Amino acid sequence: MSQRETWATRAGFILAAVGSAVGLGNIWQFPFKTSAYGGATFLVVYLAAALGIGLPAMLAEFVIGRQSNLNAIGAFERLGHRNWKWVGVLGVGTGFWILSYYSVVGGWVLRYIGGSLTGAYFAGPASYFGSVSAGLDALVLHAVFMLLVVAIVAGGVEDGIERATKLMVPSIVVILGALAVWVFTLSGASPGYVYFLSPDLSQLSLSVSFDPFPSFSGPLTNVIPFAVSQAFFSLSLGMGAMITYASYVGEDQSLFGDSITVVVLNSAVGVLAGLVVIPLLFVQGVEPGSGGAGALFISLATAFAELPAGRLVGAVFFAVVLIAALSSAISLLEVVTSYVVDTYGARRPRVAAVLGGLIFLLGTPSAWDTAWLTWFDTLAYQLLLPLSVLGVLLFVGWVYGRPAVEELLSGSSLGQGVGATWLWLARTVVILAVLLTLWLGVQTLFLDGAVVPPV
Ligand code: PHE
């Protein structure tokens, strides 16, 4: 095998990891899932999950990736545990699944850049969303988005990905921050802040009964699977992405420090997007929960239609969202591409193109009808993501064990105690929390009948 590429700089890796993490998950999914599933309650569970489960799980993925120096599937084999390859396969499969509809939403974003410039949505933001979010329009833009992703991945790690992500995070923070300030000045926004930021403690409850299987009830049953999986989704966990990215990292770098940076920045961007979108929904009189997948697009389009220089602001905003979406989508495609390139020694550009084509095909139903998109998304949240993260934690916690601590500590000045605590937590509390998430997800999936595809 030829010499593996590595990141040019330490900042390169952090930026790419942040670039992978910050994406439509934060800007599109987070506000709409928050407004659909309980507002501040969702926020509390999400933040707790990001720190309490996401951080340890991210460290687990970093360790697997750096130690093995290989792609997300090959890694398990190289670490001497062939039987655990299924975890990698599940992760890569989950990434494949998610990218198929992620790309459809990326296509919407492309459309909204144009729609802002021409003012096409100014007259009727809601009906505009309805007409461009499904059907032939959406399909064509889904194809264009996927082509862009393929082009960047084909270029290789340093040239393509590293360069594309450097400017993105600062621009996102600046634009979202400015919008948040503007929203704050609007009348009618305040109930939005209450809904988003002040949790009703009575909603944070969950009860369990055993007859004979555990069955849960209470307000949190619905919130947990979505909020915890939202943390996984937005941190790019359970899809082999962080394994793959960490495989390009040197032994002299502190994985611990890097992962904290990623978690904090990522959650901050999500909350910032929430501070823009949720109060806006209230200003516009949209009932929380009824915004759906169009919440971001409709609420912001309505806002841009009212703003002075709205066309320009809108176009710039959606352009930045596009960059965020691209840098995330790149890392999803990179996972599969790197597996095929490592394993079969095939040429990177060709592999990226073929895989991109397959993912495009898988996404066609979602582009055609948003009911399919919702179905793909629900299955990812309630089943695939928690299952896949569970696999990673079981592997690192119970199978790989001690060597993982050594790998974690390499390149950092942390003491053994921190490493041992991490491993112990990953083995116990964190795994239990993921099990609960999975159980609740599957429970609601079957109770609602949401497993049945919308044919
Ligand atoms: N974390 C990305 C987002 O929030 C999505 C993603 C998941 C990207 C997994 C890569 C890998 O949009």
Positions of the model-derived regions?
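Membrane-embedded translocation segments of transport machinery
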Residues: 2-4, 171-326
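Helix-loop-helix connectors at the membrane interface of multi-pass transporters/channels
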Residues: 4, 108-133, 246-253, 257, ...
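Membrane-water interface regions at transmembrane-helix termini and the short interhelical loops
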Residues: 37, 86-90, 144-168, 244-252, ...
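C-terminal membrane-solvent junction of multi-pass transporters and transport-like membrane proteins
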Residues: 80-83, 87-90, 344-356, 379-437
